[in-house]
Amino acid sequence: MLDIKFVRENKEVVKENIKKKFQDAKLPLVDEAIELDEKIRSLKNESGNLRAERNSSSSKIGLLMREKKIDEANQIKQRVVEINNKLVDIEKEEEELSLKLKKIMMTIPNIIDPVVPIGKDDSENVERERFIEPKTPSFPIPYHLDIIEKLHGIDLDAARKVAGNGFYYLLGNIARLHEAVIAYARDFMINKGFTYCIPPFMIRSHVVTGVMSFAEMDSMMYKIEGEDLFLIGTSEHSMIGRFIDTILEKDKLPQTLTSYSPCFRKEKGAHGIEERGIYRIHQFEKQEMIVVCEPEDSPAWFDKLWHYSVELFTSMGIPVRALECCSGDLADLKVRSIDVEAWSPRQQKYFEVGSCSNLGDAQARRLGIRIKGEKGNYFAHTLNNTVVAPPRMLIALLENFLHEDGSVDVPEVLWPYMGGTKVLKP
């Protein structure tokens, strides 16, 4: 969410940014926001003048009463009553206009970083760098579900009976590999200096609207019926929420957290859930990382975070690339985002396994996360990044380390988490 003062003073910049994101339908909102802001400031000025008049009049009443000027005192009393009634009306109107303005401001997208490529959708994202040269196997790679089923590692039919499409039972060594990936990712981030955290798996609505756009909220979040609670779509939401309405000391920054959580998503959108497989599902587990830092430090942290993801994947021998998200693919709160994609030998292309985002002060502004400064408090910057989402990591592992006989090599860094198991065999 942008500062209304910034919008007022940089109207054309804000409009040009909206155009870069191909959201021209939002252009009228800029003028509407400025108009509402002018009305609110006018009402504040009027109410300030009325309060000053009321205070002055109230001080006169006692003096007039002591001087036995009853009629004059009563006239002033009547004026004070009129002022109070007027203030009630003004405050009500100001509150209504402020709510309208807030809703509009939460719809206007954040200003994107100058390095972000301009494009309409993810088809125009730009490759930045590749890590580890992909290998083409001498035999055809089956679909990931077929690999897992041959390893007796999944029961989708039972899950479908229990919960419907978009869920699974993982079994045996596949379930163990899933947990090994999570445990390794946890230790990897702890060794990078991050504090390990297990957060709430449900959050209140004001936290939801503080961390994401209305469009994201509608397409992702499950609401608990009869409660002001939502199941988290990622632990970033509850980790950032930890700092709501907080004034942070400069010497306590940056705040770096890594967390494990189950994640729940409606996947209501263009992609939807996957009928057969574990790539796009309603429930999965994930290791996430977030940073709350000084504004000037967020670009450097952004580069660190996505490189951590690359380092994690390459430590397991998985080829990956970094893909810069274009303007039209960026969610409204994001300043910049890089997707990390793993190589799929079956498809002979890369697929998304994680995403790193710098949100500037958008989340901090919505949630009231400030830093204590010598000349007043100011908003922090927040960043988030996927450490690992095991369902997609499993696909990458199974495809890249599959042998023709159906066995799968376990990356060496995972051996300690697999009880020494080095190969998964059918």
Segments and roles (model prediction):
Residues L27, R130-P426:
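TRNA-recognition modules of translation machinery and tRNA-sensing kinases, especially anticodon-binding
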